[in-house]
Amino acid sequence: MESQQLSQHSPIFHGSACASVTSKEVQTTQDPLDISASKTEECEKVSTQANSQQPTTPPSSAVPENHHHASPQAAQVPLPQNGPYPQQRMMNTQQANISGWPVYGHPSLMPYPPYQMSPMYAPPGAQSQFTQYPQYVGTHLNTPSPESGNSFPDSSSAKSNMTSTNQHVRPPPILTSPNDFLNWVKIYIKFLQNSNLGDIIPTATRKAVRQMTDDELTFLCHTFQLFAPSQFLPPWVKDILSVDYTDIMKILSKSINKMQSDTQEVNDITTLATLHYNGSTPADAFEAEVTNILDRLNNNGIPINNKVACQFIMRGLSGEYKFLPYARHRCIHMTVADLFSDIHSMYEEQQESKRNKSTYRRSPSDEKKDSRTYTNTTKPKSITRNSQKPNNSQSRTARAHNVSTFNNSPGPDNDLIRGSTTEPIQLKNTHDLHLRPGTY
């Protein structure tokens, strides 16, 4: 009877022994990481076999409780896990970094709401990520692009709705050098304009038409950080992002101003290299033009020393100014101020010479005026003389005839005249003439 009872409970004892051994092994100081996989599998098989051979126990009321045997439930061995550490639940992309992007964190970690204006960047579904860009994403800045160019169109031209021609917008290239940042910004602005975001971009002459939405700001930050890595940004861009890494608009505005400044620099250098002066304009105006160009270039970080500036100025001089004494004799130590001093002196000499010539020599207009006056004054005189000539000749003839008639007529008066030539002659006639002997 006892042997039969022992045989019935022998599997239980075996399981209990295995359980006790297993518990002892767990309680030892041995590192559980040292347990080999073969031992773990063997223990699992033994525990499974013991549980399968265990008979069905009757209800607690029929079978008396035996305090000398261990309970089968207490001998259950926990199932081994696949690894030494429990498997933890992994965080998905939306739950990772829910506070937003860190400074230049990976763009795929940022939760991105659907972008309403460009559906190609936001697949359907709430909290959806950016879709993968086409195969040409990741090209360098030197790769030719359909939108490449030195100028970008006005933002007002980008207000139209999406059409079949701009549904697939070509993304900008990846920035690879800080020196190419302004060229990259030109392409990036075209990319935003083709994405119907031209009205939120400021220009050199006016501010943005409207304020961007939160979705548009997210799209702006994502694309900027994706295509402009932080290690290739200029220092002034990093300074702006260190204050607010989402202030992309400030970067674009300052970039546009720098582009305009670069264009002005090119124009100033071109103007300086093509100067021309021959004295036809005042020397003050010429000096002001050149001085303003030199000051602008100096303020923009392009200083020009006196030697180079004087060479530009002397190359543009012509006429008498080309042979300035100072330029010929002391051009090595010449300054811009000294050169303009000589130009002013020569200009004043030319003006003084012109004033002196106008004083001593009458202008052709004055000569024409004098000739016209002489012709007009002589004609009336000739006409007057011709009109008075017959009257004068007739009166003189009449007077001579009267005198001759009076002399030839006989009378006592005539005898007195013939008889005495020394005495004063007194003529008594109708004209009452008195003649002296010396004048007869």
Curated annotation (Swiss-Prot):
Keywords of the record: Cytoplasm, RNA-binding, Transposable element
GO cellular-component term (any): cytoplasm
InterPro entries linked to this entry: TYA
Molecular function, one GO term: RNA binding
GO BP term, pick one: viral translational frameshifting
Region feature (RNA-binding): 299-401
Ranges of Polar residues composition bias in the record: 20-31, 46-55, 137-168, 373-411
Record's function text: Capsid protein (CA) is the structural component of the virus-like particle (VLP), forming the shell that encapsulates the retrotransposons dimeric RNA genome. The particles are assembled from trimer-clustered units and there are holes in the capsid shells that allow for the diffusion of macromolecules. CA also has nucleocapsid-like chaperone activity, promoting primer tRNA(i)-Met annealing to the multipartite primer-binding site (PBS), dimerization of Ty1 RNA and initiation of reverse transcription.
Domain writeup: The C-terminal RNA-binding region of CA is sufficient for all its nucleocapsid-like chaperone activities.
The protein, known as: Transposon Ty1-BL Gag polyprotein
Organism of origin: Saccharomyces cerevisiae (strain ATCC 204508 / S288c) (Baker's yeast)
